[in-house]
Curated annotation (Swiss-Prot):
Binding site for ATP: K9, F57, R85, T91, R102, N112
Name this protein carries in UniProt: Nucleoside diphosphate kinase
GO terms, biological process: CTP biosynthetic process; GTP biosynthetic process; UTP biosynthetic process
PROSITE patterns per UniProt: NDPK, NDPK_LIKE
Pfam families, A to Z: NDK
EC number: 2.7.4.6
Function: Major role in the synthesis of nucleoside triphosphates other than ATP. The ATP gamma phosphate is transferred to the NDP beta phosphate via a ping-pong mechanism, using a phosphorylated active-site intermediate.
Subcellular localization: Cytoplasm
SUPFAM superfamilies, alphabetized: Nucleoside diphosphate kinase, NDK
Length: 147
């Protein structure tokens, strides 16, 4: 099974969209294997966005992602990276298709609700910034209902 890192950014948290977004992933059949509510540090943000460090918008990215709490999670499933990217929609919310997370909840590129790893290499770079291996929980869906 493939895994991907997803960050629900400060605007998703502030707008109370976390539950709705997680529900979409679960309904699609993706499994949460790690999740935490956290405040990203500047150092974590700089490491996370290091591929953009020489771009003019780098400091804005760092300041925005550290402006409030986020939800970090690892989702697991067949083709998880590709599926989550499709579900997320275009990076610029004003260009994202309706029915995608950004298409439904974002109006622009700056506050665009969600980050999702765009490749296995990106996941391998990003995951250790937010999770240790012992925070990833291996589990299986059960068919029985437990009360």
């Amino acid at each position: 099974m493939d895994r991907t890192l997803v960050l629900l950014k400060p605007d998703a948290v502030k707008r109370r969209l976390v539950g709705k977004i997680i529900e979409r992933f679960e309904e699609k059949g993706l499994k949460i294997v790690a999740m935490k509510f956290m405040q990203m540090t500047k150092d974590q943000a700089k490491t996370h966005y290091s591929v953009h460090q020489n771009k003019p918008f780098f400091n804005d990215l760092v300041n925005y992602i550290t402006s409030g709490p986020i939800v970090a999670m690892i989702l697991e499933g067949a083709h998880a990276i590709e599926i989550v990217r499709l579900m997320s929609g275009a990076t610029d919310g004003s260009k994202a298709q309706p029915g995608t997370i950004r298409g439904d909840y974002s109006m622009g590129i700056e506050k665009n609700i969600i980050h999702a790893s765009d490749s296995l290499e990106a996941y391998n770079h990003e995951m250790p910034i937010f999770f240790s291996d012992n925070e990833i929980i291996e589990w299986a869906y059960g068919d029985e209902v437990i009360y």
